């Protein structure tokens, strides 16, 4: 890996990103309300020509600003003749993940070396939370990429001695605000502001400069908000206040993703699977020393550590802490809110893994062997299901039929492509056993772990997941409805009693409405 130049590593990373993400975006139909709720907004834009505040789902306004929906509409118009599909609706998220991964590589490669940056990029690409978000039609991955990109640009501005205007950072913050509201500007400015203070920059200088960049970044969003208010009036203004200020101050008229304070710790731990398993295992291989609890001494050591910390390390550490604490404040908590800290965690995790290799820690081989066993067990379970060795009668309870449908879907997987993808992690798992026996521990083992992880994702994304999730899809119901009430007959009406009493965020048949081309009222 030492002979790999930055340019070659970049193109290698790009190819791997494209090959492991893009081919599988359209295989799964919509199976939750979240994705079609966003994609139908883009459908309405293309259908009605209203790119400011289109109405959908029976007259409902979008709950988020339009940049993400513009992206879907633009992609759909460019590659699919203006037709919004599962694939085109997920493409902006995939592009955002790929772009963020590549930019992260370039950022750290320039400052910390190609080898460390490449491993950090692979870890970013293969943790569960980002991998899932990069294949979803939701605003969060695009917001994450814009936020992280703005942070990188503002750090580059810091390296230049705070001289000039960071136009790219301002543009990215503008797009972030147009994706999910003021948080797209607040987060980058808050993180960089605290970082500058820790680096000894005068408070008023940092505050005034970042305030100026924040104001500039809000010009484009302000234009949209004015145009949207002219269309939506007080109804739009009330929605904006609820979704932004109400969510942050815990004064929403309805409960939205309300979770306890420890929720963020749990979701961060789960979101970094499978790498969290490696970290947990490594804790048993470290050498620990006795220490005494002396608050004054610890605080002095901590402040000295911060003062002497490498600028890139401090910037990454500040990003993690500030964003994490920021999203602990509101009652509304979701795992995806924390995604902007994932690339910075990947950087520290990559450093830690190289440290483990340097110490010749056996945990690297142990973890790789666990992944190999999982790969082999996954294939074994597939063969067992394919042979019909598990009776459907073992499933009982309310979700019995869903589980039976999942099992039948896995049993019905066929086709050379799907079977080839299923075989990949199995082959890699077998190869791992020979590789780790014949070779002494070195840095190449870390990239072998990445390959094992990617092999599992290929099988899941290309074969297992589409089969299982499509068994939950209601697309076939929409097809049957079309036979009875074709599109030529016009609008259809839905009735959901729960929506009549909902304080906010009413329930709709989002999936059916998308597959029926926004005909439900």
Q: How should each PLM-predicted stretch be described?
A:
Residues 1-365:
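Membrane-integral, polyisoprenol-dependent glycosyltransferases
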Residues 2, 167, 288-521:
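Membrane-embedded architecture of ER/inner-membrane glycosylation machinery
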């Amino acid at each position: 890996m030492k002979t790999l130049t930055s340019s070659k590593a970049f193109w290698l990373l790009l190819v791997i990103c494209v090959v492991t993400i893009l081919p599988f975006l359209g295989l799964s139909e919509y199976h939750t309300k979240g994705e079609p709720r966003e994609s139908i907004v883009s459908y309405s834009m293309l259908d009605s020509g209203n790119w400011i505040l289109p109405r959908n789902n029976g007259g409902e306004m979008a709950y988020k600003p339009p940049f993400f929906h513009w992206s879907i509409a633009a992609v759909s118009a460019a590659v699919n003749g203006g037709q919004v599909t599962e694939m085109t609706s997920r493409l902006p998220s995939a592009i955002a993940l790929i772009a963020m991964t590549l930019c992260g590589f370039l950022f750290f490669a320039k400052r910390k070396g190609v080898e460390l940056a490449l491993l950090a990029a692979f870890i970013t690409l293969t943790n569960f939370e980002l991998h899932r978000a990069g294949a979803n039609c939701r605003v969060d991955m695009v917001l994450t990429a814009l936020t992280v990109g703005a942070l990188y640009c503002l750090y580059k501005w810091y390296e230049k001695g705070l001289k000039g205007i960071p136009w790219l950072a301002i543009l990215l913050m503008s797009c972030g605000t147009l994706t999910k509201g003021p948080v797209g500007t607040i987060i980058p400015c808050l993180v960089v502001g605290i970082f500058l203070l820790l680096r000894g920059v005068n408070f008023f200088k940092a505050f005034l400069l970042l305030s100026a960049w924040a104001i500039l970044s809000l010009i484009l969003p302000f234009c949209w908000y004015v145009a949207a208010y002219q269309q939506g009036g007080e109804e739009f203004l009330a929605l904006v206040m609820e979704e932004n200020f109400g969510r942050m101050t815990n004064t929403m008229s309805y409960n939205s993703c309300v979770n306890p304070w420890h929720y963020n710790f749990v979701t961060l731990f789960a979101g970094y699977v499978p790498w969290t398993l490696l970290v947990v295992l490594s804790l048993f291989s470290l050498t620990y020393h006795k220490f005494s609890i002396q608050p004054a001494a610890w605080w002095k050591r901590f402040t000295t550590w911060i003062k002497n910390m490498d600028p890139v390390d401090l910037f990454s550490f500040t990003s993690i802490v500030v964003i994490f604490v920021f999203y602990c404040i509101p009652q509304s908590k979701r795992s995806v809110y924390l995604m902007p800290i994932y690339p910075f965690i990947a950087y520290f995790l990559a450093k830690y893994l190289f440290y483990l290799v340097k110490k010749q820690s056996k945990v690297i081989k142990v973890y790789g062997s666990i992944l190999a066993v999982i790969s082999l067990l996954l294939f074994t379970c597939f063969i067992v299901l394919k042979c019909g060795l598990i009776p459907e009668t073992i499933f009982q309870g309310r979700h019995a039929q869903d589980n039976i449908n999942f099992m039948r879907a896995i049993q019905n997987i066929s086709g050379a492509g799907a079977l080839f993808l299923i075989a990949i992690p199995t082959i890699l798992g077998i190869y791992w056993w020979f590789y780790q026996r014949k070779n002494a521990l070195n840095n190449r083992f870390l990239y072998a772990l990445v390959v094992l992880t990617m092999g599992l994702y290929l099988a899941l994304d290309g074969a297992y997941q589409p089969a299982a999730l499509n068994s939950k899809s209601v697309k076939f119901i929409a097809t049957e409805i079309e036979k009875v009430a074709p599109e030529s007959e016009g609008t259809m009406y839905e009735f959901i009693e729960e929506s009549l009493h909902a304080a906010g965020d009413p329930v709709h048949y989002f999936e059916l409405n998308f597959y029926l081309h926004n005909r439900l009222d």
